[in-house]
Amino acid sequence: ANLFTSDQDLYTDSR
């Protein structure tokens, strides 16, 4: 996830 994305995206990108 990018710094501009929401925190929700951080978890989805942690795959």
Swiss-Prot record:
Cofactor(s) needed by this chain: Ca(2+); heme b
Q: Does the keyword Calcium apply?
A: yes
- GO MF annotations, alphabetized: lactoperoxidase activity; metal ion binding
Cofactor annotation remark: Binds 2 calcium ions per subunit. Binds 1 heme b (iron(II)-protoporphyrin IX) group per subunit.
Keyword list (alphabetical) reads: Calcium, Heme, Hydrogen peroxide, Iron, Metal-binding, Oxidoreductase, Peroxidase
Q: Which reaction does it catalyse?
A: 2 a phenolic donor + H2O2 = 2 a phenolic radical donor + 2 H2O
EC number in record = 1.11.1.7
Q: Does the keyword Phosphoprotein apply?
A: no
The alphabetized list of GO BP terms reads: hydrogen peroxide catabolic process
- Tell me the protein family, please: Belongs to the peroxidase family. Classical plant (class III) peroxidase subfamily.
Role according to the record: Removal of H(2)O(2), oxidation of toxic reductants, biosynthesis and degradation of lignin, suberization, auxin catabolism, response to environmental stresses such as wounding, pathogen attack and oxidative stress. These functions might be dependent on each isozyme/isoform in each plant tissue.
Q: How is this protein named in the record?
A: Peroxidase 4
